[in-house]
Amino acid sequence: MEDLYDRFLECGGKVCTDTRRIVPGSVFFALKGENFDGNDFAAAALEQGAAYAVVERTPEGAGDRFIKVPDTLQALQQLARIHRLHFETPVVGITGTNGKTTTKELVNAVLSARYSTLCTKGNLNNHIGVPLTLLGLNEGHQIAIVEMGASHPGEIASSVSMALPTCGLITNVGRAHLEGFGSFEGVKRTKGELYDFLNATAGTVFYNADSSDICEMVEKRERLARIPYGAKYQGVKILPANVREPFLRIKLPEGRIIRTHLVGAYNADNVLAALCVARHFEVDEDAAIAAIEAYTPSNNRSQMVTTASNTLIVDAYNANHTSMLTSLDNFAATDFANKVLILGDMYELGEFSRQAHADVLRKACAITPELFLVGRGEFKAAAEDVPEASGARFFDSAEALREWLGSHPLKDRTILLKGSNSNRLFILPEIL
């Protein structure tokens, strides 16, 4: 690995994993997936400008620009850990079932008001995204914010072994990826792997004191330095959303109102988490609040969109049982008129799937009779257990719903689109 690290430094810290986006002079890692093998494209990567290719097998006549390793993914991860060890930079690790990407962006926004930061781009939070983020660390960064996702036990432990966080937070724990985790307790154990590392290193956790699950997880780890936050804990008021003020507003105990560009009361926890981190790193409160108020979400996460015909709340990047119910509760609490729901099937819920979809259907039917459901049939199957869903419309795909909307346009509605990226609900705003 020392030789590989020397080559990495020689290339100025540039790495890539996709021949469609080769960075000239970089180290190319020939990763493998279900439907591809990067080893097949290693020679092409060099031809397109990569300086070296890390491979598991070398082509005939290969020169010294090919670096052979037993496992390219492990090599990438080991390289990231070695690189991280060269820096004393504080690292904020963030995980959780819901809200981790928004929280990560808010934490980056407030810390950037004082520091030069490195932050996970988009949702590159998996076994590949985490090492790629860490390999971007350089002497100019004063703090790093690393988002960590997981769908199976041990994946957070793997991420923290590379990132070596000095502090961190778990946004929440909910019922998601149950096929991989096995149960809700499996979710808690896996997310808790971040706490396990920080407990072993006497690190700091920022935790939601309003969450009984989070508090239980924190209490079990006695060496943690604990910094609480939470709307109830802090005496914060979440002001109701309405047609005139559709975005989240938070009234602090001293009377100051934070006016965000986020949709949904559930985002209050994410805002308070970011402010908690900001205080720990001694960011001026006015600067931190200004950063939060300036932040605008993207990537179909809690976005408010006004079209010529309707008002849309687009939260179509990620969905699970917990986040779906939370979004519906928030939508129900608003005074928007003519509400419509477009929901996508939830996946990776295992044996809990039918019950989870029935739970969502019952809550959705109590909000509006105008209900459109998209996906492979999870909602359709659950509707057999929910008589009040008899008027719902089911579509196999977002494309099928888009075609139907072309001849049955909606007008003067407030429409919540909630689903996972795989549901492709993001194609619908153009026709709404």
Language-model segments: which ranges?
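N-terminal leader/targeting and accessory segments in enzymes
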Residues: 1-78, 82, 332-336, 362-366, ...
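Residue-level signal for inorganic ion chemistry
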Residues: 26, 45, 79, 94, ...
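Active-site beta-alpha connecting loops in nucleotide-dependent enzymes
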Residues: 33-36, 297-300, 316-390
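Short acidic-hydrophobic, aromatic-tinged amphipathic segments that line or gate anion-handling sites
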Residues: 67-71, 391-401
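Phosphate-binding loop of NTP-binding sites
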Residues: 75-209, 213-223, 278, 403, ...
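ATP-dependent carboxylate/acyl-activation modules
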Residues: 94, 299-301, 422, 426-427
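Peripheral docking tails and interdomain loops at the edges
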Residues: 394, 412-430
